[in-house]
Amino acid sequence: MGNLSKKALENLKEINFKVKKDPQRPVYHFLPLAFWMNDPNGPLLYQGEYHLFYQFNPFDDKWGNIHWGHAKSKDLVHWEHLPVALEPSKEKNETHCFSGDCVINEGTPTIIYTSIGPNKLPKDGAEQWMALGDNGMANWTKFGENPIMTLDIHEGLNVEDWRDPFIWKEGEYWYAVLGGHLPKPIRPAVFLYKSDDLYNWQFLNPLIIKSRKSGKNIK
């Protein structure tokens, strides 16, 4: 756990002592110890327990400074909060760990997510990064050769707001879909990719292209 995550955990425990006394605080549906959460990410069953990750700001009740929170459960009702799985790598100009997915690759828990920073903005600079977990999924280490995918993978096709990978395996190959849009005119789209090892990816084609009437992006 990095220094930022340790600071976040201490802060959460302090705030949780206060918020759990709120009579209007939900008690049945999952929620973090305190502060902001949004998208659930990478739910999976691993070694007899359900794991859930989620977009999380451990320092404020507003969106921002996005980490990956992490919890596990045996019954999907009672949850144990685990240390923050992913924190932004400030030293690598990363300010947010956006949504993604978690899979098991040859026994190794593996997260693939969208990395955002000052020089890689959501519209035209997002990258896809990887992190590897230990056997208990309590500690995560970002892959030393990140990014594993950049916008250059599209070989001249202009893709914007490219984000939120979903990963699955069919036969010998891994596949990924990411959302975004094609500009000029804006057309929301889903893009398809293929890999034999999760590290090296090939862009196949736009899987879905919709009209602007459908919105700006598909996430």
Each language-model region and where it sits:
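Beta-rich carbohydrate-recognition and catalytic domains
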Residues: M1-D164, W168-I218
